[in-house]
């Protein structure tokens, strides 16, 4: 059986098992499915840890990324909010990730461990890394701008009216709320409750991506 068809059947079986509808068995648009599959394959092709490998649906980070892309293109190309919502909910149930189909993610990004990651409708740069428990959130209608090569380590947060410059490394537990960060720096929690910035020159995302 063609790998794409087999994967479609796999996703359909999961949707019908965990989030069935009264309309019967799920049908997925082949074109949107293949666009989503191409998007995740393209994204992981730049990840050093995955270099030389094909998309692996048993890799939770890869599969979470795929389900996001699939839900996004089912919503955008097919205008099928019901199926897109079911795929979003499946992703949330399987991986503990909150990545809504209306969020516009970049071509290249990496989900480390997916559990507890929350993405709002922010602006995301390329080649960003998101680890478990991190949050990109809004404050009323204020949403962050995340620059290229940003790395968010576990349990860090960027919330509200923030502009995070390129090549910003946000260390574990750091909360950036309604504040701009210039970029080319590592952000640490300060002893006085403020943030401490350490300048860097190297692009740290090169440890994760072939760039």
Map each language-model feature to its residues.
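Glycine-rich hexapeptide-repeat left-handed beta-helix
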Residues: 139, 146-211
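Residues in well-ordered beta-strands of folded domains
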Residues: 71, 120, 188
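Amphipathic repeat-derived elements
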Residues: 32-37, 138-139, 150
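Terminal amphipathic alpha-helical/low-complexity segments used for targeting or macromolecular assembly
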Residues: 1-93, 201-211
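Short, charged low-complexity intrinsically disordered segments located at boundaries
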Residues: 42-47, 64, 97-103, 117-121, ...
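Left-handed beta-helix
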Residues: 76-127, 131-145, 155-157
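N-terminal alpha-helical segment
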Residues: 66, 110-111, 151
């Amino acid at each position: 059986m063609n790998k794409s068809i087999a994967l479609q059947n796999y996703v359909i079986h999961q949707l019908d098992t965990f989030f069935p509808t009264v309309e019967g068995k799920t049908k997925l648009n082949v074109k949107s499915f293949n666009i989503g599959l191409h998007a995740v394959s393209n994204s992981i092709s730049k990840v050093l840890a995955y270099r030389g490998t094909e998309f692996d649906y048993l890799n939770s980070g890869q599969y979470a990324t795929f389900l996001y892309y699939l839900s996004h293109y089912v919503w955008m190309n097919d205008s099928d909010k019901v199926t897109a919502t079911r795929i979003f909910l499946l992703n949330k149930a399987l991986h503990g990730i909150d990545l809504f189909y209306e969020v516009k993610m970049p071509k290249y990004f990496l989900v480390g461990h997916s559990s507890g990651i929350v993405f709002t409708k922010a602006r995301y740069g390329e080649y960003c890394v998101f680890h478990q428990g991190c949050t990109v959130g809004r404050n009323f209608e204020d949403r962050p701008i995340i620059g290229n090569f940003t790395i968010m380590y576990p349990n860090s947060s960027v919330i509200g009216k923030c502009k995070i410059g390129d090549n910003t490394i946000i260390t574990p537990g750091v909360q950036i709320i309604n504040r701009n960060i210039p970029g080319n720096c590592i952000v640490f929690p300060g002893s006085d409750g403020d943030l401490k910035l350490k300048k860097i020159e190297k692009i740290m995302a090169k440890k994760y991506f072939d760039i």
